């Protein structure tokens, strides 16, 4: 997955440069600065050791995005991801009551001070993890989903491998500093995008202030962008001595979904400034474009030797793609269909393609498929058609 991100990033950077959005030249050194040969369209002043900006699996900007370093509580993105996957699989439920173990109650760092044996609704445990970054609650989630911290950490690393997080290894579900517990900005972006695919996640990650225990325990989101950045949908902060100040911030405007990750900032204020700069750049530079083929360009294709004279092409539905802002009307479409087909034609069989380009660069290719089956004409069918022709009442005008 990481390699696919780099490939798409290179194509998109070329589009941005070709679009002439910026009037200055890109130095050769800057063009080769990012991992995998990606050319950032600009060089931003990001107060972090490592950062990345993505939309889906498209990289829009990156600096040192593959350096492994401690991720602190951004780790909890994976903890939440496995929790929501277990919820959707029906293995656990939001309204179930869970109990805090002695071990979970012993976690250091940020917590809501769960007592051993204290019971709470799973939804509240998720809330405290997502909003307050509570380590005791993160451990309760791990034990609820997998039975033990060890089993949960194994699931974390297995899921990371499945997602293509090539430079990540987890040692715990909390993000507390531990030998070998590392990730990268790119890998954090990957799991952030995956988490945001799940319904209900942003119901928690967008909470600014709330409370638990009948109002006795106040919660304030550690991610200040939730309150102060327009369109912010989350996601997770992290701070330890080893990691410094980290943040994975997500935001949506005008259909464009962005995730910005910064790692290793010196202060909390710097991590917010880093992600704000990345998000501002993304929203100012790119837009979401949904490719669609006009019906008038989907002309029926003649079919020889078939039970129908032609078959209508159908275009697959496309998700949004990222293009330079303000260039949507410049996207060109080329539809390729055959002059004819020979029966049989299967429903869903690929018979052509629609290619969307911008300034000569392909931004999306959609397969065109047969909308319905066209069976091969046989003697019995042909005889039946002849009979219909001879027995049809004459038309009088």
Regions found by a protein language model. Name each.
Residues 1-33, 387-390, 397:
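Gram-positive cell-envelope targeting signals
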Residues 20, 89, 290-293:
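Residues in and immediately flanking transmembrane alpha helices
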Residues 5-9, 71, 122, 379, ...:
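Structural motif marking the loop-to-transmembrane transition
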Residues 28-186, 190-199:
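Active-site-adjacent loops and short helices of periplasmic peptidoglycan-processing enzymes
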Residues 165-169, 177-397:
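Domain-terminus/edge residues, biased toward the C-terminal soluble/receptor-binding domains
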């Amino acid at each position: 997955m990481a390699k696919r991100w780099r490939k798409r990033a290179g194509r998109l950077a070329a589009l941005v440069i070709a679009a002439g959005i910026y009037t200055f030249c890109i130095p050769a050194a800057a063009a080769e600065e990012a991992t995998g040969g990606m050319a950032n369209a600009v060089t931003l002043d990001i107060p972090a050791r490592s950062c990345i900006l993505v939309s889906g699996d498209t990289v829009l900007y990156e600096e040192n995005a593959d350096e492994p370093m401690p991720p602190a509580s951004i780790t909890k993105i994976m903890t939440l991801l496995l929790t929501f996957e277990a919820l959707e699989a029906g293995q656990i439920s939001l309204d179930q009551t869970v109990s805090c173990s002695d071990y979970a109650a012993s976690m250091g760092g940020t917590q809501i001070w769960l007592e051993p044996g204290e019971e709470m609704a799973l939804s509240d445990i998720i809330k405290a993890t997502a909003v307050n970054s509570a380590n005791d609650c993160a451990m309760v989630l791990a034990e609820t989903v997998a039975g033990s911290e060890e089993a949960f950490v194994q699931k974390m690393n297995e899921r990371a491998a499945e997602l293509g997080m090539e430079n990540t290894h987890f040692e715990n579900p909390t993000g507390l500093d531990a030998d070998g517990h590392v990730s990268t900005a790119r890998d954090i972006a990957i799991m952030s995008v995956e988490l945001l695919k799940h319904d209900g996640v942003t119901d928690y990650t967008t909470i600014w202030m709330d409370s638990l225990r009948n109002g006795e325990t106040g919660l304030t989101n550690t991610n200040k962008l939730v309150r102060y950045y327009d369109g912010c949908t989350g996601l997770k902060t992290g701070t330890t001595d080893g990691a410094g100040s980290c943040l994975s911030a997500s935001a949506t405007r005008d259909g464009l979904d962005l995730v910005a990750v910064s790692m290793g900032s010196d202060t909390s204020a710097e991590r917010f400034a880093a992600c704000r700069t990345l998000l501002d750049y993304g929203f100012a530079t790119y837009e979401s474009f949904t490719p669609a083929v006009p019906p008038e360009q989907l002309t029926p294709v003649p079919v020889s030797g078939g039970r129908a004279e032609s078959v209508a092409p159908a275009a697959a539905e496309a998700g949004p793609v990222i293009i330079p802002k303000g260039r949507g009307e410049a996207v060109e479409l080329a539809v390729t269909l055959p002059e004819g087909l020979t029966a049989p034609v299967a429903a869903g069989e690929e018979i052509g393609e629609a290619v969307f380009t911008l300034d000569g660069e392909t931004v999306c290719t959609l397969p065109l498929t047969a909308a319905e089956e066209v069976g091969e004409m046989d003697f019995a069918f042909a005889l039946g058609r002849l009979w219909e022709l001879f027995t049809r009442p004459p038309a009088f005008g």
